[in-house]
C-alpha cells in the first residue's frame, strides 16, 4: 500500500509539472500572476498599388508588432508579439495578458520604436511618447486598440478584432492622359509645407514638429502611350492647412519641351473650400487629364493663382477602404474612379471573370455600366453608387463574367456617372 501511495504521489507531481510546462499562457505560481487567453484578429490595411515612391515600399508590411496592455489608464505590460503575428494564420493568434479586476484596454503598435515606453506611464503620456519622423521611413507606423474590458480573467475567453490604421496621410497626383510624352512629360511633384513628425497613435499634432518645406517625388509609370497613367505620391504626417501654413502640390513638367511648374491647392469642391487638414490613414488625390498649356517658373507658380481651375482638378479625399481606387476621371464637380481601367480576366475555362471596383462622389445619381457586348454579365448588377450623403458613399464591387464561347476577343464597355463616361477595357486570358 505504501508503495502504491508513492506511485500515486509521483504521478500527481508529474501531471502538475506537465500542466505548467505545456500551458504557454498560464502561470502555475499564484493567482496574482495568472494570465488570461486573448485571441487577436488583426486587420491590416490592404496594400494599395501603386506604392508611394517616397521611402515606404509597402504600406501593409509589419516588421515589428508590440502589444500594450493598459490597466485603469496606466501602462501595465509591453510585449513584443512580432513572431506570433508572423507565424499566425490569417492574422489570428493568441496572446497572454495578466489577469486583472480593473479596466483593461489593449493596443497594438506596428513598425514603431517603443523604447520610450515604460510600465507605470499614464496612457496619454505613453501614446504621446510614440512619435515618428516622416522622412525615410521604411515601414508604415500603424496603431489600433480594443474596447476596454471590465476586468480580464483566465476563466473567460476573449476574441478581439483590432483594426490597424496607418499613422500617415498620402498625397497623390494621378496623370491619366492620351497625350504623347513629347507633348507633355510629367517629371515630378513637390508636396509643400507638411509636418516632419507625427504621433503614431493619433494624439493630434506634436507642437514641436517642424514644417518640411518641400518633398519631391518622381512619378511611377503604370502604362505608356496611347493611354498613359503616371502616379506620384508621398506619405506625410498629419498637418493643418490654413493661412499660416498653406499646403500645396507643385507639378514639374515639360510642355512641348519647355519645363515649367503648375500649382494645385487643396481645393475640395467647386473651386471654393480647401481641405483644412491632412488626416492619417486618408489619401488625397488630384486627377489630371491632358495638360494643354505651358507651366510657369517655380516662383511664379508659388506666388500666382493656383492651376486647379485650369486643370479642372480638385482634391479628392479617399478613406482607407476607398484608396485602392486608382484610376479617376473628373468633371467640373464630381469624380468617377475604378480600381483599373484595364481588366485582365482570370482563366476559368469557358466562364472567365474579373473584379471591378467603382466609386463616385455623385451619390445622388450613382453610376451605370453601359454598352457591354452579349456574353457579358455583371454581378450584382449594372447600377449602383447611390447614397444619402457623401459620408455614406461606398466602393462598389462588381464581378464581370464572360462566356468565352460568345466573346472571343478583347472588348470595351463604359461606366458613366453624370457627365463622366469612363472606358473599361477587358482583356481575355
Where are these regions (language model features)?
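C-terminal motif of bacterial Sec signal peptides marking the signal peptidase cleavage site
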Residues: 16-19
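Extracellular beta-sheet/turn segments enriched in Thr/Pro/Gly and aliphatic residues
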Residues: 128-166, 174-176, 271-327, 429
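C-terminal edge beta-strand
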Residues: 264-266, 419-429
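Surface-exposed binding patches on compact interaction domains or structured appendages
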Residues: 338-340, 351-395
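Tryptophan-paired
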Residues: 50-121, 172-280, 340-358, 401-404, ...
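Extracellular/luminal low-complexity segments enriched in Ser/Thr/Pro
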Residues: 385-412
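Bacterial N-terminal signal peptides that target proteins for export
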Residues: 1-8
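Bacterial signal peptide processing site
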Residues: 21-24
Amino acid at each position: 500500500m505504501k508503495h502504491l501511495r508513492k506511485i500515486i504521489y509521483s504521478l500527481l507531481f508529474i501531471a502538475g509539472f506537465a500542466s505548467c510546462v505545456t500551458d504557454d499562457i498560464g502561470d502555475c505560481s499564484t493567482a496574482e500572476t495568472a494570465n488570461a487567453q486573448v485571441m487577436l484578429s488583426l486587420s491590416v490595411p490592404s496594400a494599395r498599388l501603386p506604392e508611394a515612391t517616397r521611402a515606404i515600399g509597402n504600406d501593409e508590411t509589419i516588421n515589428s508588432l508590440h502589444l500594450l496592455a493598459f490597466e485603469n489608464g496606466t501602462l501595465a505590460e509591453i510585449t513584443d508579439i512580432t513572431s506570433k503575428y508572423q507565424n499566425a494564420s490569417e492574422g489570428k493568434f493568441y496572446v497572454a495578458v495578466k489577469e486583472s479586476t480593473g479596466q483593461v484596454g489593449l493596443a497594438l503598435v506596428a513598425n514603431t520604436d517603443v523604447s520610450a515606453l515604460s510600465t507605470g506611464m499614464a496612457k496619454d503620456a505613453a501614446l504621446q511618447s510614440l512619435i515618428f519622423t516622416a522622412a525615410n521611413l521604411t515601414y508604415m507606423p500603424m496603431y489600433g486598440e480594443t474596447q476596454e474590458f471590465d476586468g480580464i480573467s483566465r476563466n473567460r475567453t476573449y476574441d478581439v478584432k483590432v483594426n490597424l490604421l496607418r499613422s500617415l496621410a498620402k498625397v497623390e497626383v494621378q496623370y491619366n492622359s492620351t497625350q504623347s510624352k513629347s507633348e507633355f512629360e510629367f517629371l515630378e511633384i513637390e508636396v509643400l509645407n507638411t509636418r516632419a513628425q507625427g504621433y503614431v497613435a493619433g494624439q493630434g499634432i506634436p507642437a514641436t514638429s517642424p514644417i518640411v518645406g518641400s518633398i519631391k517625388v518622381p512619378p511611377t509609370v503604370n502604362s505608356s502611350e496611347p493611354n498613359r497613367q503616371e502616379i506620384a505620391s508621398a506619405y506625410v504626417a498629419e498637418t493643418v492647412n490654413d493661412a499660416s501654413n498653406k499646403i500645396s502640390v507643385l507639378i514639374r513638367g515639360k510642355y512641348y519641351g519647355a519645363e515649367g511648374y503648375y500649382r494645385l491647392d487643396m481645393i475640395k469642391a467647386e473651386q471654393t473650400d480647401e481641405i483644412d487638414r491632412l488626416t492619417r490613414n486618408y489619401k488625397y488625390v488630384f486627377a489630371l487629364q491632358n495638360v494643354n498649356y505651358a507651366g510657369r517658373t517655380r516662383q511664379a507658380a508659388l506666388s500666382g493663382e493656383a492651376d486647379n481651375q485650369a486643370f479642372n482638378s480638385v482634391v479628392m479625399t479617399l478613406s482607407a477602404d476607398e484608396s485602392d481606387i486608382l484610376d479617376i476621371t473628373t468633371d467640373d464637380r464630381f469624380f468617377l474612379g475604378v480600381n483599373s481601367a484595364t481588366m485582365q480576366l482570370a482563366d476559368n475555362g469557358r466562364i472567365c471573370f474579373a473584379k471591378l471596383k467603382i466609386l463616385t462622389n455623385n451619390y445622388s445619381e450613382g453610376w451605370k455600366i453601359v454598352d457591354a457586348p452579349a456574353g457579358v454579365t455583371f454581378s450584382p448588377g449594372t447600377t449602383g453608387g447611390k447614397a444619402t450623403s457623401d459620408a455614406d458613399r461606398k466602393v462598389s464591387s462588381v464581378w464581370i463574367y464572360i462566356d468565352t464561347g460568345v466573346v472571343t476577343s478583347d472588348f470595351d464597355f463604359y461606366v458613366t456617372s453624370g457627365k463622366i463616361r469612363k472606358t473599361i477595357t477587358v482583356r481575355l486570358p
